[in-house]
């Protein structure tokens, strides 16, 4: 079935989703299964770059949501002490052996959990982490320990997502865009990117930076303010904006913001260590 036919079938099923259940068979189930297989293999993505902007394939998000109506809960092996989990989404590695791992070409360290319907490109390294369905992790990217990459989040190639960082997912509301980390980015430990924010190519987020859709992102060199996106090759740290005076005239509390302390070109980014960029 072509992508256009899949989209048509899934869009029609979405409009009639109240009548879809684990008993549903036929074209709808086949279309949803095929859509998830496309996501799992990397042949389709929830978001794709078109020129300088990102296009979201909402029909693929709908396929993911429909799969929860279609699929029943089942035991999933691999729990502690030979126990099992109880869920609707199996592991990406279910029934994999050496041949499948070698063909996939990425490294999966014990303790990582990757749900079926997510794509991991060759050369990626997965430390003990969680990657949700619909997510896309690019070639050569390091996903460090205790990282969460949420549903439909898009992480580019040659990125480093440091320990405990969160790349938030999005399934609902349906119109919400996924978080996108473009190629060659560094996300510091315990940082969090959420609510459809786009981190531009080559950017560096310091440890503990939190960015959501309403977070003020201030370029301290130009004074520009951004919301929802970090420009390419930005070096970003946590900061505060001055508070407004309280009614009695005393200083009010400052508000959190993210600060672009500098911007670097691709050549400088490639030659300069992360710590040096953050400290100069």
UniProtKB/Swiss-Prot annotation:
Database matches in CDD domains: LbH_THP_succinylT
Subcellular location(s) of the protein: Cytoplasm
GO cellular component, one term: cytoplasm
One of the GO BP terms on file: lysine biosynthetic process via diaminopimelate
EC number of the protein: 2.3.1.117
UniProt key word Amino-acid biosynthesis: yes
Major subcellular location class: cytoplasm
Reaction catalyzed: (S)-2,3,4,5-tetrahydrodipicolinate + succinyl-CoA + H2O = (S)-2-succinylamino-6-oxoheptanedioate + CoA
Key word Transferase present: yes
Descriptive protein name: 2,3,4,5-tetrahydropyridine-2,6-dicarboxylate N-succinyltransferase
Organism annotation: Methylorubrum extorquens (strain PA1)
Organism phylogeny: Bacteria, Pseudomonadati, Pseudomonadota, Alphaproteobacteria, Hyphomicrobiales
């Amino acid at each position: 079935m072509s992508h256009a036919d899949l989209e048509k079938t899934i869009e029609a099923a979405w409009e009639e989703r109240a009548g879809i259940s684990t008993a549903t068979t036929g074209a709808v189930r086949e279309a949803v299964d095929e859509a998830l297989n496309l996501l799992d293999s990397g042949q389709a993505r929830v978001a794709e770059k078109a020129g300088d902007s990102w296009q979201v394939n909402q029909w693929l998000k709908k396929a993911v949501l429909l799969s929860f109506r279609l699929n029943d809960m089942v035991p999933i092996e691999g729990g502690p002490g030979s126990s099992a989990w109880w869920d609707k989404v199996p592991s990406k590695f279910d029934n994999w052996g050496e041949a499948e791992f070698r063909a996939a070409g990425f490294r999966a360290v014990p303790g990582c959990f990757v749900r079926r319907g997510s794509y991991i490109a060759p050369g990626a390294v997965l430390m003990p982490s969680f990657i949700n369905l619909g997510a896309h992790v690019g070639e050569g990217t390091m996903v460090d320990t205790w990282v969460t990459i949420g549903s439909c989040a898009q992480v580019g190639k040659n990125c480093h997502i440091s320990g405990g960082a969160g790349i938030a997912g999005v399934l609902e509301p349906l119109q919400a865009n996924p978080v996108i980390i473009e190629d060659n980015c560094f996300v510091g430990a315990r940082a969090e990117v959420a609510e459809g924010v786009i981190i531009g190519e080559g950017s560096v987020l310091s440890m503990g930076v939190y960015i959501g859709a309403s977070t003020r992102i201030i370029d301290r060199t130009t004074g520009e303010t951004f919301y929802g996106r970090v420009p390419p090759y930005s070096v970003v740290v946590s900061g505060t904006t001055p508070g407004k005076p309280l009614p009695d005239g005393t200083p009010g509390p400052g508000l959190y913001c993210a600060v672009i302390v500098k911007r670097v070109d691709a050549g400088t980014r490639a030659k300069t260590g992360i710590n040096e960029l953050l400290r100069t």
